[in-house]
Amino acid sequence: MAGSQLKNLKAALKARGLTGQTNVKSKNKKNSKRQAKEYDREEKKKAIAEIREEFNPFEIKAARNKRRDGLPSKTADRIAVGKPGISKQIGEEQRKRAFEARKMMKNKRGGVIDKRFGERDKLLTEEEKMLERFTRERQSQSKRNANLFNLEDDEDDGDMFGDGLTHLGQSLSLEDELANDEEDFLASKRFNEDDAELQQPQRKKTKAEVMKEVIAKSKFYKQERQKAQGIMEDQIDNLDDNFEDVMSELMMTQPKKNPMEPKTDLDKEYDIKVKELQLDKRAAPSDRTKTEEEKNAEAEEKKRELEQQRLDRMNGMIELEEGEERGVEDLDDGFWENEEDYEDDNDGIADSDDDIKFEDQGRDEGFSQILKKKNISISCPRTHDALLDQVKKLDLDDHPKIVKNIIKAYQPKLAEGNKEKLGKFTAVLLRHIIFLSNQNYLKNVQSFKRTQNALISILKSLSEKYNRELSEECRDYINEMQARYKKNHFDALSNGDLVFFSIIGILFSTSDQYHLVITPALILMSQFLEQIKFNSLKRIAFGAVLVRIVSQYQRISKRYIPEVVYFFQKILLTFIVEKENQEKPLDFENIRLDSYELGLPLDVDFTKKRSTIIPLHTLSTMDTEAHPVDQCVSVLLNVMESLDATISTVWKSLPAFNEIILPIQQLLSAYTSKYSDFEKPRNILNKVEKLTKFTEHIPLALQNHKPVSIPTHAPKYEENFNPDKKSYDPDRTRSEINKMKAQLKKERKFTMKEIRKDAKFEARQRIEEKNKESSDYHAKMAHIVNTINTEEGAEKNKYERERKLRGGKK
């Protein structure tokens, strides 16, 4: 077992002859001459260094010997590759020398430093750079001592640059004159003696001399400006003194006015023509005549664009100008922005596209005579009562004629403000159509039909130009209808409400996912179908008309309305159940019927031809007739036709068609079993069976993914393996790039390491300098305090001695 470190150190020193007995005398006196030392001084230092390295293994960086020869041993496995301690010390010394050199050269290096603002900034223009430089120069000047070179204060001039300067930079003192004379004499003498030196360049002026010249010139120019200003002020004062005299002379002589010559008629006509030409609309260049193929292509493109816009509205997505899409919730925001821009463009245009044109543009002389005979004046009514005052003396067939005359008389091109008047009149015309629908017209049904169709046609033409006013009026009417229904329920509804729902389906797009008029109307109709108690034939007929209108709304968009399905189930069940205690068909126990008195008897003859159309004027008389069975059958047939149309146009394309039609299919089967001669439900069932065959209904299931195989990592063998080759990339260019990247990474890592070492060293040096300055300061202060204390103590002792002496004398 090895001994301690101390014993090993003594043994190593003794083995190298550095310790032990060195003055042993030789027994042979013959050879007693002084021998040379076994180790000289250099060898001794080398031996000590080897011993130090041997006993301090941490001072040497060792690495594994990859190419060792001979027997394995503890020391042969590792070889010395460096001395980190010495390397660190050398690095510290180099950094210290560099730091001292930078410290010595600080603020002593010459050269021109470009400190101008924004010189290398490419984003700034030349004007911005000059403005910012001027601003910074002003700020730097304001920060300096304001009185350093103050031109107004002459007292500071002598403090810094000698005696004060006066006019033209010359001093008035006698000493300056003597000094100047002496200098002139010396200068003339020097000029005669040293003529050759005049050819050499003059010496550079000092800063003090330059500033003296600048201040002298500034004061001289300032004095000249003051003189010029004084002269100008004197001239102004003289002019002010003579101003009143000059103006009084000018007022005495008034110029003669030339009398106005009257214009001739020819000149007046010329001026009028010029005014008319200025006010006339400029002629626009006409487009070239297009061929029939081009016209058809433009028409097809326009139709395709409109259809795409309709599909986008139906899907609830509208694209903005910036490219982003907005959904249903954003449609109400800025709905009329484009129309307002369109109105602003067309204001003041005499012949604009807002003019309403009819097929019969000619003047009806016969109707004009009727108006004159009955003393009816044409005016554009702003309310429905005003329109009723105009048409109360006319027949029902003359209502469209007077409406057309009003529109012709108030075309937008005729006068300013007619456009707003026709917008109001469009809303009034809608109210008038609803008003006529609520009247009793059993005696003149055909006349009412012609008048109603003509007024609706006119309203459709007006809606294309005044859509905003009409939409606002429709929304107001929907709110009124809802308020009436909330207060009086079904009794508040009328035939005019059904006509209103039909008209807006013609005027507006019903396929939009959200519309300012159609969507509230559809919600209100669904509320009626859900909440109305269908306990009378009139109410059922009213609901049948509503269902027909709703189905007409959804013929394009094909959206599922649950209230329609509920209405069909409830009405079909109402007509088949006669008594309250009668057993209902399966799956309809949860439907509560409003009446059990409308059930059809078993002996109803369905082979008899009956009308399936429900005229609106017959709704009021349905419950008053004595034999309502035929009317019940007519209403049932109307409901069956509505069901057939809804299945064909709306439901068949829905993915849940089987689930929607299943309860209705059971009711139709009950009708076929109870009434064998009833062909309509049997035909509907056959259609449903055919549609069910073509309807592919796939139930929901999880997505079936392909199973992922477990990755196998087989070892890769290189046939031509070379341990010296680090990369097996066949692409030589890529291999060189990777090699360069690795080298850059290594250099970057080494550079960052050196930068961190330099930063840490500089931080340590700055801390040492601060500590040294602090210690010097404290030592200096301590020395001063000790000196003061010593002087105070000496003075105190002196005072005590004097006091004692004075006390002894007493």
UniProtKB/Swiss-Prot annotation:
**Keywords carried by this UniProt record:** Nucleus, Ribonucleoprotein, Ribosome biogenesis, rRNA processing
Give the stretches traversing the membrane: none
Disulfide bonds listed in the record? none
Biased-composition ranges, Acidic residues, are 338-357
Fetch the InterPro entries from UniProt: Nop14
Recorded GO CC terms? 90S preribosome; mitochondrion; Noc4p-Nop14p complex; nucleolus; nucleoplasm; nucleus; preribosome, small subunit precursor; small-subunit processome
Cellular location(s)? Nucleus, Nucleolus
Indicate where this protein is primarily found. Answer: nucleus
Keyword presence, Cell cycle: no
Q: Which domain of life is it from?
A: Eukaryota
Show the segment(s) annotated as Disordered.
Answer: 1-44, 63-95, 134-155, 276-308, 338-358, 788-810
Q: Name one GO biological process term.
A: endonucleolytic cleavage in 5'-ETS of tricistronic rRNA transcript (SSU-rRNA, 5.8S rRNA, LSU-rRNA)
Basic and acidic residues compositional bias, start-end = 35-44, 68-77, 793-810
A GO molecular function for this record?
Answer: U3 snoRNA binding
Please give the family membership noted in the entry. Answer: Belongs to the NOP14 family.
- Outline the subunit composition: Interacts with snoRNA U3. Interacts with EMG1, MPP10 and NOC4. Component of the ribosomal small subunit (SSU) processome composed of at least 40 protein subunits and snoRNA U3.
* Role according to the record: Involved in nucleolar processing of pre-18S ribosomal RNA. Has a role in the nuclear export of 40S pre-ribosomal subunit to the cytoplasm.
Name of the featured protein: Nucleolar complex protein 14
